[in-house]
């Protein structure tokens, strides 16, 4: 049986952006707890497919819901560690300016944040794990 040499997980950030109408899509979860549960299943599939000793990367940010930060990155990190992944490093990636690269303006996101009562995050995490 062939195994993967490297695993990259870059899940949607809870329900911030809907990517499809499929019920299996993590962006369509009805709650943050459901998102965490389904993410854990995806991570388990990846763990099983990854060759022993190889690495995985989780790229994720946080969300803001009900007037508080939802620490998606750290919650998903904990689920990966519970599967047996060993955390090797955390990189905090500056994402300021990404909206301009996508043809959007920073003012649009600032307006949406003020109108919608949410916080604009300017970072995301790149977490590196190893399967032992």
Report each predicted region and the residues it spans.
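Class I S-adenosyl-L-methionine-dependent methyltransferase catalytic core
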Residues: 1-132
């Amino acid at each position: 049986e062939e195994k993967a040499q490297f695993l990259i997980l870059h899940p949607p950030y809870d329900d911030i952006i809907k990517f499809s109408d499929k019920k299996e899509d993590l962006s369509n979860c009805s709650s943050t707890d459901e998102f965490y549960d389904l993410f854990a299943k995806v991570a388990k599939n990846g763990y099983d497919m990854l060759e022993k000793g190889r690495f995985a990367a989780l790229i994720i940010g946080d969300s803001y819901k009900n007037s508080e930060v939802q620490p998606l990155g750290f919650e998903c990190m904990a689920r990966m560690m519970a599967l047996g992944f060993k955390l090797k490093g955390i990189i905090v990636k500056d994402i300021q300016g990404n909206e301009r690269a996508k043809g959007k303006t920073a003012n649009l996101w600032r307006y949406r944040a003020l109108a919608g009562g949410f916080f604009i995050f300017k970072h995301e995490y790149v977490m590196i794990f190893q399967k032992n």
